[in-house]
């Protein structure tokens, strides 16, 4: 008989954002006259910019002509995009990443999910709490986590991110092999200094560990002293893989383009202690399981690196960060403590009560959708909610007025 991967039975309920969508749909069915403002899932609300659309259109036109048609492209991505990424996102900040260390994909979610496939089932993993659920769930599926008990999986080393440590976790007190970090952080919006990030790199070097660094929100950093890439830290190219996306800075949530950086100096080890190139392993996995991002989408992504494209992306970021400022200011007035909103589009708010209860209250009384912190971590996330700045200024103002009334 055909049998299942029983690790899937260890997963907790449904995926967080699917659960939220179901609750919202039920509320709207029961209250069709009420307008709902969604500040939960981090989906952008503005259209693609003129430079991106122009490049997209031109590439689509090329696909209609036999002489300029593009069929299967290089699985790792076209050189024109990889070179633009290397020059603008890394070399311009003193990081020595080169084009062939970049793997273009259709989303950071896929990459952060799939990267764990190249590591052994016995790998000891450290994951922040709270955390983007994908990091944890994919390791549950792979059988690395053990059973779930008292709000946590038995074999995971949890890195608590709390008010006491400014939502930047401390180094683990036990030896781990694989470390997930995300800055600016999702969900908390917290950031890390270069000195703070160096401590993690030094730990990884000393323990022959690897850091998986999710930098999907780096474009929202307003403080020039903060690192945008882990490769700004000396030695990180030997112990870190970085993930980035065009989803938020360029509005590609529905277009789908991202990339992963695997430096050639980055190594992992077999059971006998022999080193192996993670670049070679990821390339093998990538080429086996992925056929590449479409040519028009890669041309659209490359347009974000033109002078016009950069200016347009900055305008998008400024638009959402202005919204974040409004959210934070409103909760200052209400007396709710929070983190984020300064270098991140997310505001992590202490709701002073159970996360799901606060979620239900805001939905029923204010018609506003947030994300309950417990969905990111039942221990350190419960009691908080995440509000996203991805919406129009008009809706943000309206939502804040409703929240103020509901909490009065």
Curated annotation (Swiss-Prot):
Chain positions found as N6-(pyridoxal phosphate)lysine: 248
Cofactor: pyridoxal 5'-phosphate
InterPro entries: Aminotransferase_I/II_large (IPR004839), DapL/ALD1 (IPR019942), PyrdxlP-dep_Trfase (IPR015424), PyrdxlP-dep_Trfase_major (IPR015421), PyrdxlP-dep_Trfase_small (IPR015422)
GO biological process: lysine biosynthetic process via diaminopimelate
Any Pfam family the entry gives: Aminotran_1_2
Positions annotated to bind pyridoxal 5'-phosphate: 72, 108-109, 132, 186, 217, 245-247, 256, 291
Binding-site positions, substrate: 15, 42, 109, 132, 186, 291, 386
Keywords per UniProt: Aminotransferase, Pyridoxal phosphate, Transferase
Catalytic activity entry: (2S,6S)-2,6-diaminopimelate + 2-oxoglutarate = (S)-2,3,4,5-tetrahydrodipicolinate + L-glutamate + H2O + H(+)
Domain of life: Bacteria
GO molecular function, one term: pyridoxal phosphate binding
Protein EC: 2.6.1.83
Pathway: Amino-acid biosynthesis; L-lysine biosynthesis via DAP pathway; LL-2,6-diaminopimelate from (S)-tetrahydrodipicolinate (aminotransferase route): step 1/1
Family: Belongs to the class-I pyridoxal-phosphate-dependent aminotransferase family. LL-diaminopimelate aminotransferase subfamily.
Assembly notes: Homodimer.
Protein's job: Involved in the synthesis of meso-diaminopimelate (m-DAP or DL-DAP), required for both lysine and peptidoglycan biosynthesis. Catalyzes the direct conversion of tetrahydrodipicolinate to LL-diaminopimelate.
HAMAP family per UniProt: DapL_aminotrans_1
UniProt-recorded name of the protein: LL-diaminopimelate aminotransferase
